[in-house]
Structure formats: C-alpha cells, structure tokens
C-alpha cells in the first residue's frame, strides 16, 4: 500500500479529474505517477429506489475497478449493491460486503501479476492500420465497409449507476470476413466492455482493400453509451486522433484495505 497523501499529491500533479472511463494509455500514465503495480478506482452512491407502488428502500452500490499498471488494462470489475430501509444501513451492508470480497480482489491481482502472457498468434495475412486520410498510404486504400449495425446492450449495472461512458477497441478485420483480435483500449466497466465485445463479434463487413485487392485491416471501434439512448458505433479514421468527451466523473473512496499490496 502507498501513503494516501503521496497518492493524492501525485494525482493532483498530473491533473487527474476522477474519471473512471480511462484509456489504457491514460491508466498507464496514472499508475506511473502513483508508482504502483495495480490501482483501484470506483464509483459509489446511495439512492432511494422503488420497485412497486407504495414501496421504497435505499440502495447503496459500488463499482470497483482494479487496473493493471503495466498494460493499463482493466484486470477486474466488480459491481455490488445492497438494499436496506435506511441509507446508513444500506451503506454499512455494502461496506461489509466489500470487506468480505477484498481477499478475492487481492487474489485476482496476484494471479494477474504471476500469469504468463500468451503471445498473440501470428497473422497469416498482413494487417494494415487505417491510414491517415492525408498520408501517402491512404492512396488506393478503402476501409472495411459494414453491412449491418449491431447495438450493444446497456447493462443493468450501468442502468443502476446511470453510467455515461465510451468503450474503444482496436479490432482486426480479416479478408475472409471474420473478426480477429479485439483489444479494449478504453474501458468502462459495468458490463459495457463485454457488451461492446459481443456487438463487435456480430459485425458483418466487406474487407478493406488496397488497389482493389482485399487486405486485412485494424481499426478503432468506438461505442458511446448513455442511459435511455441507443449506444452508437463509430469507426475512427485515423484510429487515434480524436479524444472522446469526458464521461461523468465520480471517484469515491470505497474502502481502506488492511492487507499488503501484492
């Protein structure tokens, strides 16, 4: 564990605004400033809920993000909610449940750190990144053409937490019309990353071409999630030029663990 005052000073130094919708590059920068192997961020709130007429209760929820420093990837996300008659009772139940789950979080971090990363398989075909429209490589290149639109589901956890977020993934599109590797480069938690991956896997497309011949291509796919609105998909060209709008920020101290950092 790191001293809390040192962490706060490091976060202030890099201008961290409390976002829980980070790109892998942003997460790596954050962990470098803190100096850690993993860091935990999250969102927590207590709200009045009603499931039927003349009934109401208090719900306390927490979304826990465990982020790996080296890759900036989301190593684990956990969503927990507790209901009770009063806000204090709901919050106490939530804290107790978080404390009970803390050992599993530590175990997951240890497993992640010790795991042997499997190298990506060698592509049988050459894969091109989408070129900048103004670059010489853009001449004769046509990006993949999508034949359908797949709307990812807005998860129940995101609904409960009223999440507005963006999920980005670098996706390989093969010449045979198959989807290749999907690498999440901006994660959102709350089940939205999995929803985006599932939607990407259902895309149908005509492959990219260069000088009229099919070529494998790697493109950035972006899904914007908002409550009560349909998630929208956008393919970026070039893939890493535009930064999405900042999501709603909400960083809460979820709990103070008493165990050692793995």
Residue ranges and their predicted role:
Residues 30-33, 67-131:
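C-terminal/domain-edge helix-coil "capping" segments
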Residues 38-85, 96:
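Amphipathic beta-strand/beta-sheet edge segments enriched in Tyr/Trp
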Residues 20-29, 45-51, 154:
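N-terminal post-signal-peptidase region of extra-cytosolic proteins
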Residues 1, 66-67, 172, 207:
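Hydrophobic beta-strand positions
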Residues 88-89, 104-262:
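Charge-biased low-complexity segments
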Residues 1-35, 39-40, 73-76, 105-109:
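N-terminal segment of the mature soluble domain
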Residues 21, 25, 61, 85-96, ...:
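Soluble non-cytosolic domains of exported or imported proteins
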Residues 5, 77-81, 183, 218:
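Short hydrophobic alpha-helix segments
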């Amino acid at each position: 564990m790191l001293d809390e005052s040192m962490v706060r000073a490091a976060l202030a130094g890099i201008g961290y605004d409390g976002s829980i919708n980070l790109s892998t590059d942003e997460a790596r920068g954050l962990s470098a400033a803190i100096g850690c192997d993993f860091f935990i961020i999250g969102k927590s709130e207590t709200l009045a809920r009603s499931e039927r007429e003349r009934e109401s209760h208090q719900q306390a929820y927490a979304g826990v993000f465990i982020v790996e420093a080296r890759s900036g990837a989301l190593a684990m996300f956990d969503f927990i909610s507790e209901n009770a008659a009063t806000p204090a009772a709901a919050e106490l139940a939530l804290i107790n449940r978080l404390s009970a789950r803390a050992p599993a979080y530590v175990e997951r971090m240890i497993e992640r750190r010790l795991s042997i990363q499997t190298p990506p398989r060698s592509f049988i075909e050459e894969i091109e990144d989408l070129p900048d429209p103004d670059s010489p490589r853009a001449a004769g290149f046509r990006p993949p053409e999508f034949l359908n639109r797949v709307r990812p589901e807005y998860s129940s956890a995101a609904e409960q937490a009223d999440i507005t977020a963006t999920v980005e993934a670098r996706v390989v599109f093969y010449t045979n019309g198959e989807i290749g590797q999907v690498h999440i480069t901006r994660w959102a938690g709350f089940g939205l990353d999995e929803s985006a991956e599932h939607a990407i896997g259902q895309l149908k497309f005509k492959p990219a071409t260069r000088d009229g011949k099919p070529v494998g291509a790697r493109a950035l796919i972006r899904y914007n999630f908002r409550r009560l609105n349909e998630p929208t998909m956008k393919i970026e060209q070039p893939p890493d030029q535009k930064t999405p709008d900042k999501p709603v920020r909400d960083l809460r101290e979820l709990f103070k663990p008493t165990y050692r950092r793995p």
